[in-house]
Regions:
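N-terminal auxiliary "cap/dimerization" subdomain that precedes the catalytic jelly-roll/cupin core
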Residues: 2-103
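Hydrophobic alpha-helical hairpins/lids featuring a short glycine-rich hinge
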Residues: 99-121
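Conserved double-stranded beta-helix
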Residues: 112, 121-162, 213-217, 248-285
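A short secondary-structure junction signal
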Residues: 116-119, 153-158, 174-179, 183-188, ...
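Double-stranded beta-helix
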Residues: 168-224, 229-230
């Protein structure tokens, strides 16, 4: 396998796996339970500050989200898009390492950049070996997240399957059950209907019943959770992570059903429940 210590020492060859072996329980629980596993992405050299600055320089600007979170108590989760025209990758990295609340999402970096694509392909191969499944995941979008020490991700639910590969820095992650107390149907319907992005109402009292509360991540962890599980993240230091997002037939089926329920609720005044619906009702939607 060929990895790149980008712009530092050129191309180096190394025969290495990127993930530790999974136990039989971990293989059986993939996609069913919250799990924290180990990986070695940092050892590729592709996620150093120097390598990431080079990636930012060559990645299409329209696929880079540079956001600042202002200190506004009335809108604590507000994100302001920053015009980074004229800024090079090193400047953006330095901004993320400043005292501000900075969030940089390098969208589809793992898919589009040849150096990172090679790593993504190997991850797919290793995940297939560990789980026996890969067809849907092969269509994933792989983005790289670069965020400041004060940045956080508010309580939300993803309509896609999500794999969080934490690579550098210290962050805390909370993952919650999927029941109505944590994720009411109406709140999730708002997500698939496009009424909101992915954020949901949150009360810190929910932390007492979180499945993971919290997981301290220091780099080298892969965090997995069942589709639609609410979660949130708080940085402690400057952080670098990679996120895989993809849909499966099951997640697409659920989203379509929740979309239909949202329409029935909003346009016809009905009160459908996805969790209590029979299999026949779910298929009919």
């Amino acid at each position: 396998m060929i990895f790149c210590n980008c712009a530092v020492s050129g191309i180096v060859e190394a025969n290495m796996t990127l993930m530790n072996n999974w136990s039989e329980d971990e293989k059986a629980n993939y996609g069913k339970k919250v799990m924290v596993l180990q990986h070695r992405l940092a050892e590729t050299g592709l996620f150093s500050d120097e390598a990431l600055a080079g990636l930012l320089d060559r990645h299409p600007n329209h696929l880079i989200d540079f956001q600042h979170i202002p200190d506004n108590p009335d809108y604590p989760d507000q994100q302001v898009t920053v015009d980074f025209t004229g800024a090079d990758g090193k400047t953006m990295i330095n901004a993320a390492k400043s005292d501000g609340k900075i969030w940089i999402n390098v969208r589809e970096a793992m898919n589009r950049d040849p150096l990172y694509r090679e790593i993504l392909d190997q991850l797919h191969a290793e995940l297939e070996m560990q789980t026996g499944r890969n067809k849907d995941r092969r269509n994933c979008r792989g983005g790289i997240l670069i965020s400041s020490a004060k940045a956080s991700t508010p309580y939300h639910s993803d309509p896609t399957m999500t794999h969080l590969w934490h690579i550098r820095g210290h962050k805390k992650a909370w993952v919650y059950p999927r029941g109505q107390k944590f994720m009411p149907d109406e709140a999730y319907e708002s997500i698939v209907l496009g009424e909101v992005d992915e954020d949901m109402p949150f009360d810190y009292a929910l932390d007492q019943e979180a499945v993971v509360a919290p997981a301290d991540l220091y780099g080298g962890e892969l965090v997995l959770w069942p589709n639609r599980s609410p979660h949130r993240v708080e940085n402690v230091t400057y952080c670098v992570s990679m996120v895989m997002e993809f849909s499966t037939k099951k997640s697409a089926f659920t989203n379509a059903g929740m979309f239909a329920n949202g329409v029935l609720r909003r346009q016809f005044g009905l009160h459908p429940s996805w969790s209590e619906a029979s299999a026949a009702e779910k298929v009919s939607k």
